[in-house]
Amino acid sequence: MIEQKIGVTEMNLTEKEFVKFLSKFDEHPFDVKIGDEVSHIGKGEPEFKVIFHEIPSMKELLTSTSIALGEAYMDGKLEIEGDLYHALNMFLGQMGKFSTDKKALKKLIFSSLTKKNQQKEVSSHYDIGNDFYKMWLDETMSYSCGYFKHPEDTLYQAQVQKVERINKKLYLKEGMTLCDIGCGWGYLLIEAAKKYGIRGVGITLSKEQKKEFEERIKENHLESQLEVRLMDYRDLPESGLKFDRVVSVGMLEHVGRDNYELFMKCVKSIMNPGGLFLLHYISALQEHPGDAWVKKYIFPGGVIPSLREIIHIAGDHQF
């Protein structure tokens, strides 16, 4: 439902088409302001207002609604009056209504899964400098979902609790070997080495992460227990490494849908008999190629795995 509330000047055809396009996102009521015109979308009192100083073209919206609206906000052409998080949540909750021209955005949405390209994608995100990440991550430098036991928990507490929970689930014992695939800045392995006496290897494609992790190993005097390697998970089978435990936290999102089975095979190849593998990732109920704006500006090549596809593939490989 579209309701024109205020009108000082008549909307032109392009503006009317634009408001009509936005009208499908009507699960929550909101206002759209273009110039002096305010239109109401949905039923009930508006929960927020979207103010457009300049509207995207219909071609931009149809090519990628996500990129068109995301870049409009980045460029100051779009403002949210009200709760920004709520507005984002409302639009993203209706992502199925977004338009995406997969042919025009083929290279962005379905990027190459070769080692060379994935190394480039990881580097573009993680090698922009450790100082940048230290500005907004907690002291553990954990870059994956936290475990909030209580609403008032700090980010630091949530990350510590997450790692404690993971290490307990791994049933670690002194002298065991542990591989962390996509080890980040190393907090999980450092805690496992200090509290359980394990020997571990972390692998990452980020030179900056490797550098920081190596410094942390020295600071904690864990040189005899831990090492970090610049390595692609696909090189694990030929590495000669074997482990009692394998863990991967928030890395599967970088693997790519066509490589999930290969990932499981690589993990299986380095596990000792009776070993245990813990896999943590952001999941979705259904398969989706990923959001175009997120792929362009945040996680190049990133894909959210569905729960059902990973359970199916894991079962096929006796996990």
Language-model segment annotations:
Residues 174-182:
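Conserved class I S-adenosyl-L-methionine
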Residues 185-196:
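Conserved SAM-binding loop of SAM-dependent methyltransferases across substrates and taxa
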Residues 220-235:
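Conserved SAM-binding strand-loop segment of SAM-dependent methyltransferases
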Residues 274-282:
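Conserved beta-strand signature within the Rossmann-like core of class I S-adenosyl-L-methionine
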